[in-house]
From Swiss-Prot:
Top-rank EC class of the record's enzyme: transferase
Alphabetized Pfam families for the sequence: DapH_N (PF08503), Hexapep (PF00132), Hexapep_2 (PF14602)
BP-aspect Gene Ontology terms: diaminopimelate biosynthetic process; lysine biosynthetic process via diaminopimelate
Pathway connected to this protein: Amino-acid biosynthesis; L-lysine biosynthesis via DAP pathway; LL-2,6-diaminopimelate from (S)-tetrahydrodipicolinate (acetylase route): step 1/3
Catalysed reactions, semicolon-separated: (S)-2,3,4,5-tetrahydrodipicolinate + acetyl-CoA + H2O = L-2-acetamido-6-oxoheptanedioate + CoA
Function: Catalyzes the transfer of an acetyl group from acetyl-CoA to tetrahydrodipicolinate.
Protein name (database record): 2,3,4,5-tetrahydropyridine-2,6-dicarboxylate N-acetyltransferase
Length: 233
């Protein structure tokens, strides 16, 4: 999907306020047919839209003794991804929206956020609290360090997403701006702000990031990925 297609999808989608209700009381006389309901005559868990659940509770006050509502999202346009479809290691607390592609053996750590339309290559690790923006493309066997930001192109809209080629190491808290392409085997130093394309096999650092050298054997030893962290079984 291109940027405008994603914008149109978000703009035209039916917004949802997903809510979970916990109910106690005399529930056998309440009609739950239009909801997902799990429970007994005295206790139940209800899944549905906030306004519809509130209306049901108001209309059945005489049957409900206590209730508690948990609102999972408010006017949400895009659901979270179904994690079961990925052959990857995804740790608790990662937030992945729908329409995200994740390659086999990838690792998504706690607190990572991956927005709609992003593509993560095989064996790539998205470390803790890193943000991968909409439509960003990350190749195979990369490491996106903790707190790094890979800019998205949904707002402000941009035709060209960030592209990170294979075997790239992005240090903690680095920022890659919209439309930038990082060549394969490159290393982005921690805290760098990358505002222009980086040739393959380059090491960049600073704000704004500048090429400081080519990748050498010493650099490779310091930035190698650990295959054992990508094992699923």
């Amino acid at each position: 999907m291109n940027t405008q297609e994603i914008i149109n999808l978000i703009a035209n989608s039916k917004k949802k306020t997903l809510t979970v209700a916990y109910l106690t009381g005399n529930l056998k006389n309440i009609d739950f047919k239009s909801f997902e309901f799990f429970g007994t005559e005295n206790f139940g868990i209800l899944f549905g839209e906030y306004e519809e659940i509130v209306k049901l509770i108001e209309n059945n006050k005489e049957h409900i003794e206590k209730y508690k509502l948990e609102i999972k999202a408010r006017n949400s346009a895009i659901p979270l991804a179904n994690l079961a479809k990925y052959n990857a290691r995804i740790e608790p607390g990662a937030i992945i929206r729908d329409l995200v592609e994740i390659g086999d053996g990838a690792v998504i750590m706690m607190g990572a956020v991956i927005n709609i339309g992003a593509k993560i290559g095989e064996g790539t690790m998205i470390d803790m609290n890193a943000v991968v923006g909409g439509r960003a493309i990350i190749g195979k066997n990369c490491h996106i360090g903790a707190g790094a930001v890979i800019a998205g192109v949904i707002e402000p809209p941009s035709a060209q997403p960030v592209i990170i080629e294979d075997n790239v190491m992005v240090g903690a808290n680095a920022v890659i701006l919209e439309g930038v392409r990082i060549g394969q085997n490159s290393v982005i130093a921690a805290g760098a702000v990358v505002i222009e394309d980086v040739p393959p096999n380059s090491v960049v650092a600073g704000v704004p990031a500048k090429i400081i050298k080519k990748v050498d054997e010493k650099t490779k030893q310091k930035t190698q990925i650990v295959e054992g962290l990508r094992k699923l079984r």
